[in-house]
């Protein structure tokens, strides 16, 4: 990094919890790589704020899932983006890093790039999984892409976008061999007997749509596997309050409801029933058999079905290039089907051993010291724009 008279300024935008995790990891690397006087600001969550990040807006303002669901929030989201764009154009940062949230960030990045501000995007959109013209948007908006998965840079570079594979911070954070015994002690669960972790989502809309179905499936599983225990982590106090009535409505269930501690809950489990998302990668890194599911409103589902061309949605299956764990989506996600599939994952020891091998290979491939790699890439972009 060339000698810097004024403090470096890096603007970042993360729009949801997974982006907050990535942003916090990147900020840790940037604090180690860039001068101590550097400033970091923009939109982020609590993890980013904990590592000297100035959040001008909380990321919850952007964390809206689904095409239809987003419509009611569009005016406020556009207002925030417009105000942030004006701020950044008036006082240009040395670099802008958009963390996932492509619908919000690409338009902003294109405007900033047009004004000569270096733009970096962290998390390549699933151009390998979805139809449409996102690659064209990337070409217009992004100077450099930070990729979580090893096959992505080649796809981007063919389109003329510079890219760096940085791995995934979860692969750095999670040990290769999970401590199931220690996790059960931490949650007050007995060491013996089967435990199933159930994760119905990290948003109110997700829990409202699939939570009742998951709990009905839990009832069936307990009938078919007496002695099974369930642990259900709630991402926030608000979501815990939303889940509590479901727990109360099923008094026969042996269920532990936690606030946060999703990774501990999954570590303690023998099998996992999980709503699709980044958490499925976390489950794979913990070497756990799982069933992946989701339900979205009908119109959102129709749009997603027409845009997608891969036969799977779960990250473990996408990374493996084949179905290694079952997916039950939309109308296929019935309580009976979910119960059967989850109990099969629980009971099949040969499948468990095969998944452990597959998931260990994934873990090693993604364990790349992401914070350092990503920070080095950002520093190179900034340095390349400095006058010599």
Curated annotation (Swiss-Prot):
Keywords: Glycosyltransferase, Lipid A biosynthesis, Lipid biosynthesis, Lipid metabolism, Transferase. GO terms for molecular function: lipid-A-disaccharide synthase activity; phospholipid binding. One of its GO terms (biological process) is lipid A biosynthetic process. Coiled coil: none annotated. InterPro entries: Glyco_trans_19. Pathway: Bacterial outer membrane biogenesis; LPS lipid A biosynthesis. It is an enzyme of class 2 (transferase). One of its GO terms (cellular component) is membrane. Its EC number is 2.4.1.182. It catalyses: a lipid X + a UDP-2-N,3-O-bis[(3R)-3-hydroxyacyl]-alpha-D-glucosamine = a lipid A disaccharide + UDP + H(+). SUPFAM superfamilies: UDP-Glycosyltransferase/glycogen phosphorylase (SSF53756). Disulfide bonds: none annotated. Pfam families: LpxB (PF02684). Condensation of UDP-2,3-diacylglucosamine and 2,3-diacylglucosamine-1-phosphate to form lipid A disaccharide, a precursor of lipid A, a phosphorylated glycolipid that anchors the lipopolysaccharide to the outer membrane of the cell. Belongs to the LpxB family. This is Lipid-A-disaccharide synthase.
């Amino acid at each position: 990094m060339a000698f810097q008279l004024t403090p470096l300024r890096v603007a970042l935008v993360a729009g949801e919890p997974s982006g907050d995790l990535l942003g916090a990891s990147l900020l840790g690397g940037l604090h180690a790589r860039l001068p101590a006087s550097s400033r970091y600001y923009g939109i982020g969550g609590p993890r980013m704020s904990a590592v000297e990040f100035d959040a001008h807006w909380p990321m919850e303002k952007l964390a809206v899932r689904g095409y239809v669901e987003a419509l009611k929030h569009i005016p406020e989201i556009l207002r925030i983006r417009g105000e942030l764009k004006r701020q950044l154009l008036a006082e240009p940062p040395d670099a802008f890093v958009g963390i996932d949230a492509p619908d919000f960030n690409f338009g902003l990045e294109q405007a900033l790039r047009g004004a000569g501000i270096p733009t970096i995007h962290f998390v390549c959109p699933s151009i390998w999984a979805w139809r449409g013209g996102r690659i064209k948007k990337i070409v217009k908006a992004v100077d450099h892409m930070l990729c979580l998965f090893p096959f992505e840079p080649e796809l981007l570079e063919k389109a003329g976008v510079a890219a760096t594979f940085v791995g995934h911070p979860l692969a750095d954070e999670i040990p290769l061999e999970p401590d199931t015994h220690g996790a059960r002690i931490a949650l007050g669960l007995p060491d013996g007997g089967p435990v199933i972790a159930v994760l119905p989502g990290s948003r109110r809309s997700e829990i409202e749509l699939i939570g009742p179905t998951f709990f009905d499936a839990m009832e069936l599983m307990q009938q078919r596997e007496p002695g099974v225990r369930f642990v259900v982590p709630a991402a926030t106090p608000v979501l815990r309050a939303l889940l509590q009535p479901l727990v109360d409505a099923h008094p026969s269930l042996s269920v532990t409801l936690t606030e946060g501690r999703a990774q501990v809950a999954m570590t303690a489990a023998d099998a996992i029933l999980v709503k699709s998302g980044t958490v499925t990668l976390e489950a794979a890194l913990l070497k756990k058999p799982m069933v992946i599911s989701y339900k979205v409103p009908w119109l959102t589902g129709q749009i997603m079905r027409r845009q997608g061309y891969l036969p799977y949605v779960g990250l473990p299956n996408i990374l493996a290039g084949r179905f290694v764990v079952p997916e039950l989506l939309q109308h296929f996600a019935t309580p009976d089907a979910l119960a059967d599939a989850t109990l099969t994952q629980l009971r099949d020891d040969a499948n468990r051993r095969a998944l452990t091998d597959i998931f260990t290979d994934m873990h090693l491939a993604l364990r790349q010291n992401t914070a350092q790699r990503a920070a080095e890439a950002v520093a190179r972009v900034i340095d390349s724009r400095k006058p010599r």
